């Protein structure tokens, strides 16, 4: 079969399945592809290939499918550790998630942990699929499980009362055994995902931001900073701010070039050189950003959700304690920071995921959901995400 051209005629949304081990995440993923995509069997999805994100190896399965309204890229992870790593590194960014919970078991430890992770890494919306309803004969019991899931979501600041909960059986859908809880439930689920998970704002519509990778001085022209535009658009003649590491300063972009050609603007995804007025070669450095004035502030202190690599993954061999001082690699540069462990946490072991407070020695242009690597002497020992800014 010839590869069909990817049609960009529908909004694109990234989602994933989360939930406790053996509650049916992979079966549900397979069932969705059966009705909305190119069918992928359970074992095709379960044998997820390994990939690297921020120096960390993660197994993830990617499938795609579409509803009449949208095109979806869907990620499913085989193991619990892969979920933790995936959500923290943002290897597969999620605009929303389908929480799969077995009606027979109700919420379990990883159900709770995945909801907490979703909250910490800023997953905007969750839809619930209550799976294996054919294993529960008692309607009252089913209602209790639903109530329990709603309360759990609310306890992590998701709108538990309003979240759509669809009851069904992924297995019934795969085996065509009971249309009502099988195919009908899967179609109802995707209708809920279409309606409830918001379409993400495209990077190009967001305020301009470009991490600075390099600085050059061109005689007779001035200083050029290069990098890949992360979001938004920058037009020649526009005022921008240089943020991070040093006090924030303003400048004007007097030229944009790409592949040695002069352009009138650069936009999200472009690798550009921006000529900046009145900035000396040593007045700007790698690790700062160019951005729309006032859109991003520099910060030193933040709460982070982090995953610490195991020894086998090439990480530390020993635990660390409060006042641990590694480097935090933000966008294009390393900054030393001091880690404070939460009350009651004595130490952090390799393989743990943990919420910590970090204070950097210099401020970095920072906002919630910004990802970073934790490094020691250039070696990655962990990954993290800014959960909230302290100051």
Swiss-Prot record:
Region (G2) location: 55-59
Pfam families: GTP_EFTU, GTP_EFTU_D2, GTP_EFTU_D3
Domain tr-type G: 10-201
Keyword field contains Hydrolase: yes
UniProt xrefs under PROSITE patterns: G_TR_1, G_TR_2
Catalysed transformations (reactions): GTP + H2O = GDP + phosphate + H(+)
Residues holding Mg(2+): 26
Keywords assigned: Cytoplasm, Elongation factor, GTP-binding, Hydrolase, Magnesium, Metal-binding, Nucleotide-binding, Protein biosynthesis
Residue numbers spanned by region G3: 76-79
HAMAP family for the chain: EF_Tu_B
UniProt-recorded name of the protein: Elongation factor Tu
Species per Swiss-Prot/TrEMBL record: Rhizobium radiobacter
Name of the coding gene: tufA
